[in-house]
């Protein structure tokens, strides 16, 4: 439902054109009925702002219909993806397919978050790189930042001065001083240079198009401090700024097409990367309203585009959206019927030329324009003087025409000219290559020269990413050649042009893997023969990735590709159909249920939202499937309209899909009528997988109607039969009997009850077969293997936990856990195992797992430093985690993220501490809305002994607008229960009278840690409230100093906050301090403990804690020498046996930078051996431990292997647990010495 906008006067100005009506009035509208409500809504919300053009800027709107101010509102809804920090800055993420599952690429952000904490480092970046494809809106976004700052809407508190530079213009200057550079970056002087430079941390430099000029921005004088008035070459000045030898505290925003910035900015520090992905769905539509001054024209144009999924997808790129609008506007002006059948950007450009360039200029003047464009591309020039134009043979009349039609622009600040957009210049350059080559003056030599020029300009690795190369592929396709011949009234030599394509492919393919760039080129070409031939050559041998442990043999033919946008999705799905080595297309990898991935498949990953438009273009491309036989959409939540579009595609005559997976897609009985319509049609579908969907009896009956149709070709149907009634199951069996080719299979077979106690394997199998025959279940096959556990419900799959250790898990223990406490759940599991005779079989789970209907579900560490965890609950039910004491009741499969928070981060900003007492941990929980019906938040108040009312318990929510106190639905021992919760940082507090704080009984825990140093034992003893975030903080702190926890029972009695306790023990123990206060301190604060020096622990010792006031014993523990586990497992021998691998230091660089928490002891051990005095002090001078480690690794580039071995030995001595953890995660072997 749309929210009603606030009644306020809009400050949005509106463009007017030649007496056209004002867009803010609706009195005289005469538009199509379909779009009237939508347009009126946009007008009320102020979503149709004015758009202006500023001379000399890459703004893609016709000058005659727009004013010359306020560019800011044009691209406010560009999709921005903040990437995770690259592991190797010199080899940024390439969009090529691989055999392993890719790591998640980042998350979507708003423009306000560009200089917010980075998702990888949690630091505010000094350098932000805006990257993206050609024409995606990077430059406009950069100008938006400058304008929004100037108007006080963005970063006003962060920066005092913001300077904007177009690098294409900056490259025209030979030498500049810092003062001249700053003056050039301001529209008007704002302050004296001395005042500006006095606060460099408040300066932002925006460098637009940093990769356009042919320069290398090296820091030539890193040690030289230059005066701001001293002039030097521009590239040197910029290199010094980016290299931090000048104004090291300043901030930078760079825009670039390429991610390989290290090539021409060698001193570039680690940036925050943000990729511009183009327009969101609503912004595509809004653009039409911005472009056309006449609202009816806007509606008509967008309706035409919206009816064509390919054209709508192409409009995701702002530059292409401008191209489409311009073509439609020209057709309107010329009185033509609106028609755009273009399927590619190249075809749109040819259409644009045919509509805008008069016939008299096409033969000679357009060729001259193409030569000008090509010369500029090869020399990295985008600005041209009048003499440049004359040199290419462009006359005044032609230049005036090109300016009038918008092909060329004249710069207001100079006498220079430029193309309306860099992409347009690259398109003309591509035409120039073909026209020159087609003259056949030099034959193959000319082709070699063109290809070598392309390689020199873009590099082999980025050749297919270059728009010029993509345009070449498009122009040399059959439709492209026809368009050029018609445009230039000439005949092009097809064979010669085809040779040029093969030259490009041969030159580049050996140097790069199959990537999205190549697919883009092939898509532009659209030639079926070329697509088939090239895609056939891409087979290669795929090696299983590190995450492919479950099906190592079967998944060697699985390839993975990340597609972030609808454009990439369209290109990938179009080309993959010609790839004969892929039989199945899968969108977003989901762990499969009950079937093996046998067919060769391509898995497409997408971290950005999948919209209706995304599904539309996917299904549009699948109407002609060619080599594809299977489609797997498992794990994607599908709306009804999406399934409707899918079924329309499946019924299309050209669609030859045979297998469809819709496992866990949120389907209900309502969807079954759509699927039944496919079964009743002459579709090619033979296998359908519908497990883990709530279809119900009614839905399955609809499917049965489709299955009864004589034209139905389905032979295999997978369903969950456990929730179906006996009547429907009988109906399915009857269908199988009547149709011998039909097999209906199920994961669960609950009606099969076999007493398996004291039966051997043969007896179990025999009994199962007999029972199936007796129940008439013969057609239904029980899918199981020799590795499964066969029991009352048939085969139970054994899950591989660790292949190297031969560790397996049997998770299928069915326990109703609703309203059960931790102890009840564990007891129920034990009882069930005893009753089933499963005593020898251990359920492999830990206290960190969530225990639910099918046993333990592992918790995944997302970000260790932030204490951020993720658990994927596989089905509806109740789940409890013993270590955190969190408890969720969920209605369906859901992924939940849990972050441990510190109360001090939030409470310091509120008066809550005076009236309320913290009585539980603080969690930041994220889950899909509606999936969690109840959450049990732990508290440590003893209800049986407290006089506090359960009405005094509150759940504190910390939200953007402030804090909210919510009354829980229920309070029970150890938990408060919220039903249908909304999530934010949340935890339990208790309303109190301040004087009563020390009379609240709480449950507490004791934590004991030990460290053995040369056979002398030191213990640390803590007494703290039962709060998992505090325990985790203590664990982490003790681990820094190589202390290991010993598990001992907690105090039996309830204790009181503020009470004091005496620590004592056996004779000859040195205890400091001997008195402990039980207090609640936030997990970020220092926790109180007693240090106990034992000496040589040859025999057992006793520890006791007594209440100081009454000297009552509240806790006692006996420590034996056997409680002290060996410090480290075998490492040395593993290292001796290791082959020649990457050194431990290099292999674990990222983890060491993030996790070495005490650098100075490490430096002390390296001092004099590896580090000289200067290097030692240089590392110590860094502010943070992470910066110190980065500096140390920077110095290590010149180290020999022997020096790295010394580093490894020092690290083992100072951080043995970290070394151990890294070795275990890497398989136990990493060459260090």
UniProtKB/Swiss-Prot annotation:
Gene3D superfamilies, per the entry: Death Domain, Fas (1.10.533.10), P-loop containing nucleotide triphosphate hydrolases (3.40.50.300), Ribonuclease Inhibitor (3.80.10.10)
Function: Acts as the sensor component of the Nlrp1b inflammasome, which mediates inflammasome activation in response to various pathogen-associated signals, leading to subsequent pyroptosis. Inflammasomes are supramolecular complexes that assemble in the cytosol in response to pathogens and other damage-associated signals and play critical roles in innate immunity and inflammation.
Effect of residue 673 to A: No effect on IL1B release under basal conditions, nor in response to LT or metabolic inhibitors
Residue sites binding ATP per the record: 132-139
Region feature (UPA): 984-1133
Annotated site residues (Cleavage) in this chain: 983-984
Lineage: Eukaryota, Metazoa, Chordata, Craniata, Vertebrata
Cited SMART domains: LRR_RI
UniProt organism field: Mus musculus (Mouse)
Regulation: Activated by cleavage by B.anthracis lethal toxin (LT) endopeptidase: cleavage by LT promotes ubiquitination and degradation of the N-terminal part, releasing the cleaved C-terminal part of the protein (NACHT, LRR and PYD domains-containing protein 1b, C-terminus), which polymerizes and forms the Nlrp1b inflammasome. Activated by S.flexneri IpaH7.8, an E3 ubiquitin ligase that mediates ubiquitination and degradation of the N-terminal part, releasing the cleaved C-terminal part of the protein, which polymerizes and forms the Nlrp1b inflammasome.
Protein name stated in the entry: NACHT, LRR and PYD domains-containing protein 1b allele 1
UniProt note on tissues of expression: Widely expressed, including in macrophages.
